[in-house]
Amino acid sequence: IDTVSSPTGIRMPFEKLVEMIQERGVDVLVDAAHGPGNVPLDVDKLNASYITGNCHKWICTPKGSAFLHIREDKRSGVKPLVIGHGHSSELAPNEKFRLEFDWTGTRDPSPWLCIPHAIKHVGSMVHGGWTEIMERNRQMAIFGRDLICEALDTTPPTPDFMISSMSSVEFPSNEDIESIPLDGDPIHNQLYDEYRIQVPVISWPNHNNKYINNNIY
């Protein structure tokens, strides 16, 4: 289950969905690629079987930094793709689990080590911390979406309560758009070439979705 759908920018009611599905005995993996720093995410309260999310998108950590949270009763069934010294250790289960994932091959752990510092630093930039940052970003995303919708005389594709720091806008077309041309979407190219603004363009039948990402900077 997505926290926020990347192609559409829709904020899913993932908290309710996790509860409803797990009540039926089904394990849930929450895809929080656009979760940390974008929407409130309490992994203990959510209590999903598995949660994974990126930190380089909204928390501003180095690329390649993410987290994987596995509920304690599910940890014995999960192993890293590359085994290390932890595989043969005789530690207690929780310590063995952590050691197995701590050091796999020659991967540089620096991006992960930046996560707590980034959370503290970015959160200190405004008086209200992360709660204020996320709400400010959300309001700016709605403001930007409404400006574009007014200019295009089009209706917002989603209600405000399904908006986070991301919001998509439909750009109408008379053609049946199946895929973006190899040389790129014309509006995407113009925004980048002339203004150095990079905008994701998602193809849908009869229109393109372009979405606004608004962060603290």
Protein language model features and the residues they cover:
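Structural detector of well-ordered beta-strand residues that form the stable sheet scaffold
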Residues: 29-31, 52, 79, 157, ...
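Active-site phosphate-binding strand-loop segment of PLP-dependent enzymes
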Residues: 1-33, 37, 58
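Active-site PLP attachment segment
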Residues: 46-91
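PLP-dependent enzyme catalytic core of the Aspartate aminotransferase-like
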Residues: 180-182, 189-217
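Conserved PLP-binding catalytic core of the aspartate aminotransferase-like
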Residues: 135-142, 149-194
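Conserved PLP-dependent catalytic core of the aminotransferase class-I/II
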Residues: 111, 115-157
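A short glycine-threonine-serine/GTX helix/turn-capping micro-motif
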Residues: 95-110
